[in-house]
């Protein structure tokens, strides 16, 4: 790897206007908030939290460009370029690489029942076309794709596949991956399981709630790495109270409302997602006050 990619990342939120267009100024504010206020190490751009799969190619490029402009070279940047259209994934990968992103990431192809060989070659094709490092995005609950330890071994044999964003509750597989590949990067993708993932030896984490709860996540990560498990768990309990409440109100509109409370122009979610339900306003205000969000 050209840059040490260990650490904590915001899965960058993207603000939209009423017509579903990207609010560039708001996006810059959200990116800067993640780095300057939440004190995170980097941004994971155009992932699920960016509502990526609702965007067209030009909007995805726009998000890559604006996020890069917002934070420059001072932080780590990972570009999620995965797409069912391999040509789009390659086009996005080339664009992000030209912008100076430190690594690419790509969700496994989904919807159709692809063979492992097809999935493997999808990654190899993106790498060949871009010559950038690749982080596998494993999120089987949404893709239906479960990668075995033997298949991870085949993927990791490629020198440019440097790691995995592991968003799965299978901690046995996580332990097996960590033991088998001590030099590969493992970034946890479940905010609500950060303490468990850290104990299992991950190198960092990527989270949507880190856009508003990154400092608490940092404390969890550091305490768990230092062996202060009871203290880390107490903070994880607090984080999970936040996460549970946010999920109950709709994750993307609620996170954007918390950012709006900070005078950030966080915009709307993209349709068909609904905007924040004002019936939840009192619950949200209480959450912000209780946990200093």
Swiss-Prot record:
The active site is at residues 137, 165. Its EC number is 4.1.3.3. InterPro entries: Aldolase_TIM, DapA-like, NanA, Schiff_base-form_aldolases_AS. GO terms for cellular component: cytosol. GO terms for biological process: carbohydrate metabolic process; N-acetylneuraminate catabolic process. The keyword Cell wall biogenesis/degradation does not apply. PROSITE patterns: DHDPS_2 (PS00666). It catalyses: aceneuramate = aldehydo-N-acetyl-D-mannosamine + pyruvate. One of its GO terms (molecular function) is N-acetylneuraminate lyase activity. Homotetramer. This is N-acetylneuraminate lyase.
């Amino acid at each position: 790897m050209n840059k040490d990619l260990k650490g904590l990342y915001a899965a960058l939120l993207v603000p939209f206007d009423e017509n579903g267009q990207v609010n560039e100024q708001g996006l810059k504010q959200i990116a800067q908030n993640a780095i300057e206020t939440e004190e995170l190490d980097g941004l994971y751009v155009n992932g699920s939290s960016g509502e990526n799969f609702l965007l067209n190619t030009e909007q995805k490029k726009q998000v890559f460009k604006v996020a890069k402009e917002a934070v420059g070279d001072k932080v780590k940047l990972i570009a999620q370029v995965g797409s069912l259209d391999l040509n789009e994934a390659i086009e996005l990968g080339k664009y992000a690489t030209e912008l100076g992103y430190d690594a690419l990431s790509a969700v496994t192809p989904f919807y159709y029942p692809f063979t492992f060989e097809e999935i493997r070659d999808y990654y190899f094709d993106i790498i060949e076309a871009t010559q950038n490092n690749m982080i596998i995005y494993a999120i089987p609950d949404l893709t239906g794709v479960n990668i075995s330890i033997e298949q991870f071994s085949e993927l990791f044999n490629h020198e440019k596949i440097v790691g995995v964003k592991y968003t799965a509750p299978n901690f046995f597989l996580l332990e097996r991956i960590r033991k088998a590949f001590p030099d590969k990067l493992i970034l946890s993708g479940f905010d609500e399981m950060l303490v468990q993932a850290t104990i299992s030896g991950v190198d960092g984490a990527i989270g949507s709630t880190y856009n508003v709860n990154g400092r608490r996540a940092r404390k969890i990560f550091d305490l768990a790495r230092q062996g202060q498990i009871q203290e880390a768990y107490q903070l994880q309990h607090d984080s999970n109270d936040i996460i549970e409440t946010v999920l109950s109100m709709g994750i993307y509109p609620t996170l954007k409302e918390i950012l709006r409370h900070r005078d950030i122009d966080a915009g709307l979610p993209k349709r068909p997602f609904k905007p924040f339900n004002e019936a939840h306003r009192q619950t949200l205000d209480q959450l912000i006050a209780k946990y200093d969000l």
